[in-house]
Amino acid sequence: MKASGVGLVFVLAAAWSQTLAGEEDTSATAHLVSQIDVRDFGAETARIGDLNADGGPDLLFVQSVFGTRAITCLTATSIFGEILWQTGSPSLDNGRIYSDLPVQIYDWDKDGKNDVLYVRQATYVDPAYDGKSPRERAPKYEGEARMIVLDGQTGKEKGGFALPAPADDCFLFADLTGCGRREDLVVKDRYWNIWGVAHAGEVLWHWEGSVGHFPACADVDDDGKDEVFVGFALIDHDGKVVFDHDAKGAHQDAAYITRAPDNTWRLLFGNGGIHCLTPKGEELWSHPLGEAQHVLAGRFRADSPLQFPVVDRTPVPHGRDDNAWGILYLYDLDGKEIWQRQQDKGAWAIAIVPVNWTGGGAPMGILVYGHLQGRPAVIYDGNGEIAATLPMAYTPSRDEKDRKADYYGLVADVWGDSRDEVILFGSRGACIYANPRLLETETHYNETLYPGM
């Protein structure tokens, strides 16, 4: 993404202040470029995208009722925390989550500007909400769920359509109709049902089974339409089942589709292990693990084109307490373990995101957050070494309890320098880190009045 004018001003001002001080710490592994006062709209769910149509990225903070997952407030801000718009009522009590939330940023109507889409729940007739326990589905609903489309610049409602009542867990965009753009939807309930929905709101198909957390989609049969992978099953664009393995009461915690260097597809998912499948459902390799909660694919090392980072949150049975810990693994294309890194005690809920921290065509890094107790996020390189440490930066008004609240992470190139920045966000704070190391590009150090290199 191209940096906005305000972003450039901020960077130049920061660089100028460092020059005036005469001390720029070139050994630093990360530079704090934005510290956001989230006041009462902080959230453990956030999205990033250009909302005000100025060419630069913005943030969307999403609050919900913890137990019901009903979305209560959406707050759009600049990357420096300036509020662009807000819909709903913010509350310090509604920033926490236990699951994904059905909200995304996308140019839904193809007018060249982003919209915000979210699902408004149908009425759960029973069970009655007790005010604290998670409520994942109901035996009976009143009405239907509804996809709401908001104008990204103003937050005003501009459209919407009905969805099946239980379809309020999360959704993703896919090309199910062969239009050449991912403008159809895959929607689901928490664990049991999934629907394909056309852009106009028509339900194309419904599949009942172990759908897991968040599906993955790709055109693995090269017919111009996406297939939907839910871990134990692969569903074609028209709802026909390509394969469906017996989940035996389990569900996928993470799903990923990638193309190997030989142009064949790999379908990976995690649950009580990490599994690598072909598009026909044949298992190429697997490793039993306690709880493979996160699975990625990418080039994280220079010695081979594709590796798979995996998080095991439960390598030994535990009560999810301060004595529990997780393990980060890195596997090669054939499933051979390259390395593993056991986390500190208490860091069992870690999550991972691929991050282009170095840029310049270098291998990706692995952002690891969720160490709990206010501990910093870190970036691992492909050798299993920590390349950067990123503590959550809170505004001075936050007390010690706030500073130990959970927070999450996402990445995006907010400066337009070909490298990712890291955005950390939670119910009590948000901040953005950049890589301060010099990125050398030929056009930066060989400038000329007569371009033509």
Predicted regions, residues:
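Bacterial N-terminal signal peptides
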Residues: 5-15
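Beta-propeller-forming repeat regions
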Residues: 18-453
